[in-house]
Design a protein with these regions (language model features):
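Conserved phosphate-donor/acceptor-positioning beta-strand/loop module used by diverse small-molecule
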Residues: 68-71, 82-102
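Conserved nucleotide-sensing/catalytic segment adjacent to the nucleotide-binding pocket
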Residues: 23-82
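Conserved beta-strand scaffold positions in the cores of enzyme catalytic domains, especially
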Residues: 25-27, 86-88, 135-140
Length: 165
């Protein structure tokens, strides 16, 4: 167990706001689109592997209290392959309209919203299935909550045994 908690959380759950309010939070969620852009599938896999290795080193370093990372299923697969211990925050599918509204309010284009949620809805179910039996703990976020609201519950699970380590 590490002092740094990795949190993978869906779009529109309040990651950026949480990171801006806390100096000990590193938000790396936006990097995945930048590191994969224009690469072949093989090169993407290599980049994902390297990126997750870096995340693992950052987690072990203890420099940050929380590191926020993507829920892209390609990355989740690599989190599992590299045996990361972490939290993943996903919305209830029936609440998805709330996240569409949040995306509009924060200024995302209709094209972005449509593309994201067409993929996102499919990925939620895929990710839930992928993480069963792994070191990844699932937290469901309700339509009235933001990531910040789940932090006490995440801390209870990931920080509970630090006193005994």
């Amino acid at each position: 167990m590490y002092n740094t908690i990795l949190i993978s959380s869906e779009a529109c759950t309040g990651k950026t706001t949480f990171a801006k309010k806390n100096k000990k939070v590193l938000d790396l969620d936006f990097f995945e689109s930048k590191i994969l852009k224009g690469l072949s599938e093989k090169k993407q896999q290599e980049q994902i592997y390297r990126f997750v290795k870096i995340i693992k080193k950052l987690q072990k370093s203890g420099v940050y209290e929380y590191i926020l990372i993507t829920t892209d299923s390609r990355f989740v697969k690599e989190y599992i392959n590299q045996d990361l211990e972490m939290a993943i925050v996903l919305p209830h599918i029936e609440d998805i309209h709330t996240y569409v509204d949040r995306a509009r309010k924060r200024g995302n284009t209709l094209k972005w919203i449509k593309e994201y949620f067409e993929v996102g809805l499919k990925e939620i179910s895929i990710i839930e299935e992928m993480i069963k039996g792994t070191n990844i703990k699932l937290f469901k976020i309700s339509k009235d909550e933001f990531l910040e609201d789940l932090i006490p519950n995440i801390d209870k699970i990931f920080k509970k045994s630090w006193f005994f380590d």
